């Protein structure tokens, strides 16, 4: 009877040990999975990465021919944007460049620790830093037109610091760092889009055009129309106005207008004025933290994400069917628009080349880093396989047995 009881206890003890060993092994494998395979997705068939990690961006053109020389420092745009510090993104919104869509991306589509608070019926969102009630974004949809409607580079650089000092007085103890960004668009498409917008009644007459501490006089900036707006104007009428701010708008809004006497056209000769404006716009564009092109939405998204180390929740969409795209114009009219926007044509050609070179540089750098990581992982895997197994000289030991159960068994 005692032998049966002793034998029963032995069987129970062995069964308990086996259950403990199996449970411990399962826990060990789960822990090992967490450390060894964090990049795998249980929900993705075939071990593929989840959709967020798939490469949504176009492959760089290997046959792209560079037009301009840019040093590496102009192609490297990897900033340490400190949202919890005193850094501020300032969006320079040029009319009819897709800035409204991009501006909404900034307040509604960026993956943030503390998302912007956008409430129905309100035109502005509250974009506070994660650690305090201060804004990290200066834009139409966050701070409104605080420096005037569609303020340009000259206005923003002189206005933004003061506006934020008044809004966030507690931040006066440390200087802010401003990161200017903008979007550019093909000049002909942008010009036609602005004409259609004006034709529907838009005026932007509340824009300040502040420069050197004052607004332009009526003599310096005469209106193109009489009355409240220019609705119903024909394309020919739009092109015939010599004071139309749509002409070379992108260069004017990116240049330092103080260099040419602001809107005083008699300050310097016309040819020299044009050259100074173009060179200033190129310089300021290069100095910006980021700029995108309306015609390349996915590449614009890619460069913004890599520049600021921020991720968008949803990918950008390329919409080629715009109001400007529906306008039928003949070749003579297109040439006329190109002549009226000659400075913008030169700037866009320059910007497009810089944009493409930055994209290619970033993609090649990223691919190179991926290859290096893959090579290191393969070498590490081979090194682990080459290590001798320490438990190979202990026959009879169950592979899934943990250390404590092995010691108990020896007792």
Curated annotation (Swiss-Prot):
Cytoplasmic-side segments: 11-17
Record keywords, A-Z: Coiled coil, Disease variant, Glycoprotein, Hypogonadotropic hypogonadism, Kallmann syndrome, Membrane, Signal-anchor, Transferase, Transmembrane, Transmembrane helix
A GO molecular-function annotation: heparan sulfate 6-sulfotransferase activity
Positions bound to substrate: 123-124, 140, 145, 150, 197, 204
Post-translational modification: N-glycosylated.
Top EC class, one word: transferase
SUPFAM superfamilies: P-loop containing nucleoside triphosphate hydrolases (SSF52540)
Coiled-coil residue spans: 352-387
Main location: membrane
Pfam families in alphabetical order: Sulfotransfer_2 (PF03567)
Positions annotated with a glycan in the UniProt record: 264, 320
Lumenal topological intervals: 38-411
Tissues with expression: Expressed in fetal brain.
GO biological process, one term: angiogenesis
Chemical reaction(s) catalysed: alpha-D-glucosaminyl-[heparan sulfate](n) + 3'-phosphoadenylyl sulfate = 6-sulfo-alpha-D-glucosaminyl-[heparan sulfate](n) + adenosine 3',5'-bisphosphate + H(+)
Signal peptide as annotated in the record: none
Task performed by this protein: 6-O-sulfation enzyme which catalyzes the transfer of sulfate from 3'-phosphoadenosine 5'-phosphosulfate (PAPS) to position 6 of the N-sulfoglucosamine residue (GlcNS) of heparan sulfate. Critical for normal neuronal development where it may play a role in neuron branching. May also play a role in limb development. May prefer iduronic acid.
PANTHER family: HEPARAN SULFATE 6-O-SULFOTRANSFERASE 3, HEPARAN-SULFATE 6-O-SULFOTRANSFERASE 1
Record-given protein name: Heparan-sulfate 6-O-sulfotransferase 1
């Amino acid at each position: 009877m005692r032998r049966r009881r002793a034998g029963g206890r032995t069987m129970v003890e062995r069964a308990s040990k086996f259950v403990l060993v199996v449970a411990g092994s399962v826990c060990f494998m789960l822990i090992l999975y967490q450390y060894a395979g964090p990049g795998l997705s249980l929900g993705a068939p075939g071990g593929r990465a989840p959709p967020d990690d798939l490469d949504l961006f176009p492959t760089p053109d290997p046959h792209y021919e560079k037009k301009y020389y840019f040093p590496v420092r102009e192609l490297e745009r990897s900033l340490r944007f400190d949202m919890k510090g005193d850094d501020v993104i300032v969006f320079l919104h040029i009319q009819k460049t897709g800035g409204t869509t991009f501006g909404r991306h900034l307040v509604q589509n960026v993956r943030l620790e503390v998302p912007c608070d956008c409430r129905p019926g309100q035109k502005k969102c509250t974009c506070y830093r994660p650690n305090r009630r201060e804004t990290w974004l200066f834009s139409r949809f966050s701070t409104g037109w605080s420096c005037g409607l569609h303020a340009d580079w000259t206005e923003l650089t002189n206005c933004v610091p003061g506006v934020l000092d008044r809004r966030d007085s507690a931040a006066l103890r440390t200087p802010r760092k401003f990161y200017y960004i903008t979007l550019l668009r093909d000049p002909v498409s942008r010009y036609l889009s602005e004409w259609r917008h004006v034709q529907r009644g838009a005026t932007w007459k509340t824009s300040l055009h502040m420069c050197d501490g004052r607004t332009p006089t009526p003599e310096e900036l005469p209106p193109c129309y009489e009355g409240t707006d220019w609705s119903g104007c024909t394309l020919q009428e739009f092109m015939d106005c010599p004071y139309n701010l749509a002409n070379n708008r992108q260069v004017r809004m990116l240049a330092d207008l103080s260099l040419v006497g602001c809107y005083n056209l008699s300050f310097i000769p016309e040819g020299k004025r044009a050259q100074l404006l173009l060179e200033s716009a190129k310089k300021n564009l290069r100095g910006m933290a980021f700029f995108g092109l309306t015609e390349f939405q996915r590449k614009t998204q890619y460069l913004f994400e890599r520049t600021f180390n921020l991720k968008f929740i949803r990918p950008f969409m390329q919409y080629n069917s715009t109001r400007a795209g529906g306008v039928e114009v003949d070749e003579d009219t297109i040439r006329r628009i190109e002549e009226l926007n000659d400075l913008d044509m030169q700037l866009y050609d320059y910007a497009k080349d810089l944009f493409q070179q930055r994209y290619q540089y970033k993609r090649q750098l990223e691919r190179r880093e991926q290859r290096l990581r893959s090579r290191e992982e393969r070498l590490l895997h081979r090194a682990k396989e080459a290590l001798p197994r320490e438990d190979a000289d202990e026959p009879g030991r169950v592979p899934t047995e943990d250390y404590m159960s092995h010691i108990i068994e020896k007792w």
